[in-house]
């Protein structure tokens, strides 16, 4: 029996949202019992994780309300990254903090404005489009140059002789996530289908970044929620690529 597009999206979105809710509840129950668990940070990261998933589900479906939930998500993510960077024993993720606080946050308003110009509303999907060859070349060049620049800057700011090998690995993933998020947000705001290729990479590197933090800093209880969050983001980004491929067919 063939499942309709509308029904598939409904069930997939429900799976992502319900699955994320259950994962957060189970994680909280477990982590609250651990000695030294930081309850406030755990709950805050959980709220951010849930609003972030709603944000990405709406984005995958071309709904402009994605920017409302995105505003909540990036505000919380900014605080989580800041706390991780300044807390004694925490890992420096200043690139992640700068990304959310000084770029992602204002870009929610830019994206809302741009999607409105392309016909999006709470009931009408945005008119998606695709990159041409020249735009792909520009995107690739920006990624290469941005990654090298971000890595060198973050190494200079966050390098540590005592833990150089581990810290520099964290900084590499931090730089990759930083640059990919910047490029992905631009593509998202301008309604390009190829944003989802970028988001898939962002989610893979983010899982590695926060997974490494969870293993190296067991007292950072909220990092587990961040790992789960990006796993669901990854699944949703695959569906987003599928949906936007159809939305952008024949568009430039």
Question: Language-model features: where?
Answer:
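N-terminal membrane topogenic signal
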Residues: 1-18, 133-138
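Membrane-embedded alpha-helical segments in integral membrane proteins
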Residues: 16-32, 75-84, 146-156
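Short, hydrophobic transmembrane alpha-helix segments
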Residues: 25-38, 57-61
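Helix-coil boundary and interhelical linker segments in multi-pass alpha-helical membrane proteins
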Residues: 30-32, 79-96, 156-164, 214-224
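Membrane-helix interface "capping/anchor" motifs
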Residues: 54-69, 186-198
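Hydrophobic, ordered structural segments
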Residues: 72-118, 124
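Alpha-helical transmembrane segments of multi-pass integral membrane proteins
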Residues: 99-115, 127-155, 173-180, 184
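C-terminal transmembrane-bundle signature of multipass membrane proteins
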Residues: 184-252
